[in-house]
Amino acid sequence: MAQPHHFIRITTCKLLYGRVPKAANSSIKAALCRLLSERPPQGTKTTSDKFWQHETNNETELITLRKARKYRRSHFSFSFVRNPFDRLIAAYNNKVIEIEQPPLPMQHMGIHHDMSFESFLDVLIDTPIQRYDVHVLPQSHLLCLGRQVIPKFVGRVEQIDEHWDILRNILLREGINVMESLPQKNVRRSEKNSLKEYFHNDSLINKALQLYSDDVNLFYNDTSIDNLINNAPLPQITPLQSRSLKLSSWLQDHVFNR
């Protein structure tokens, strides 16, 4: 299977963004549009792959993880991740409950409108990862190549105001001026404690961990599963930063192999 093009490369300022659906992706894309020499016409769907690949006057392109690794020395790269339990529920609500027909890749997986959350989990468990819709792909699959974390900076959505500010200051030192705060795009579920109604027993939690334990271990290893289920405040940390692939490999080895 051809490797998906999950990274946006902005050629004019040597910037790479690793896209993670359901992790402030639309808001970050809206902010990155401000870096283009020409603003998109009003009404342009800037969340679409077509826009970033074909409608930016050759200032951007979509690239694979492997190609992003090649550009890593000459470009600054970043991404944001989300509590895996919360991201999973967001994908379920948005793609299975709120719309009449899930995206075609989900339909091909056997996912259908209004199916139960547990049945949704069972389909994910039974489906080879190569057939996953991007909205349910583990974040580690989107951002890691083998044992290497590709982005140099990985912030967390739960601390996005603080982490975006840190990222903005880093980019300013690189001569890249992004928005001070992110626009609010596609914000749907407002109940911060609504995860428990989905993960109300150990079986459901274990099924989710069977799918996304790497995401928890890599990006949320400083808190407990209970805290993630409760959407409790996270410890104040500096975002995961890795200047070299050698260091990112060390992070992977020491986190995944604990």
What residue ranges belong to the model's regions?
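Membrane-interface amphipathic segments in extracytoplasmic regions
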Residues: M1-R258
